[in-house]
Amino acid sequence: IYIPYFVYKTLVLWKLRLDSSAMITHRGRIEYRGNGLNDNVLLYVHGSPGGYDQTTDPGKNYSVLTPSRPGYLGTDILSGSSPEAQAACFKALIDELKLDKVFVMGVSGGGPSAMHFAAQYPQNTSGLILFEAVSYSENFLEKDEALINARDIDLFIQLSFMTCFGSKKLAASMLPNKNNRARLLANKRNIRLLKKVIWSIWPISRRRSGIKNDYNQFIN
């Protein structure tokens, strides 16, 4: 298993570098993905853990801009640890990209910084969308500690098994809200996208600073 694993990891890390762009702002270097940005831009704020690769597809009438939040992949944690500071990073990025207004979507652990962006910069916010967003503080769970401290190879094996689950079990493991699970299961394409999202937490070693910071921000 070790040789295929190391080959796969090398390819993943190479692709992560290849598929992203970076902008030097007054908040530091911010990694992002956003091609063909137009007048209708969705600022997609990824969850915990995640990165610019945890995103959604552009639509017919809108493009998608996904930054890596501080501590994830190519954005240094020093750019901003609190949700307020991360919102300031997003503001710095859209200013450099000459974007006046964006729709903001906060997913999971990206919810707090998305909400702060909308509150702090209403002049730059066309709308706010929240999906399974963190909206209150809570303490670590045992499974959270295990994820934060996981080795890349152990998580690789775990995710490989997870993506072999039946659709219902897989959805239940990822989405607490029953209505959201039902909508996801109604479309086979959604299951394929969910499996893609699951792998966007790997390799965890490139996202560990971000998830540790998130939990420090979110716990009681």
Predicted regions and their residues:
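Conserved acidic catalytic loop of the alpha/beta-hydrolase fold
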Residues: A85-F103
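Conserved donor sugar-nucleotide recognition element shared by glycan-biosynthetic enzymes
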Residues: S82-A87, G111
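A short loop-to-beta-strand scaffold at the N-terminal edge of the catalytic core in hydrolase folds
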Residues: T25-N35
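Conserved HGGG/HGGXW glycine-rich cap/lid loop of the alpha/beta-hydrolase fold
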Residues: G34-G74
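Alpha/beta-hydrolase
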Residues: I148-A150, F156-N220
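N-terminal membrane-anchoring alpha-helices
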Residues: I1-S21
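Conserved hydrolase catalytic core segment
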Residues: D100-F140
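Flexible "cap/lid" loop of the alpha/beta hydrolase fold
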Residues: L128-L159
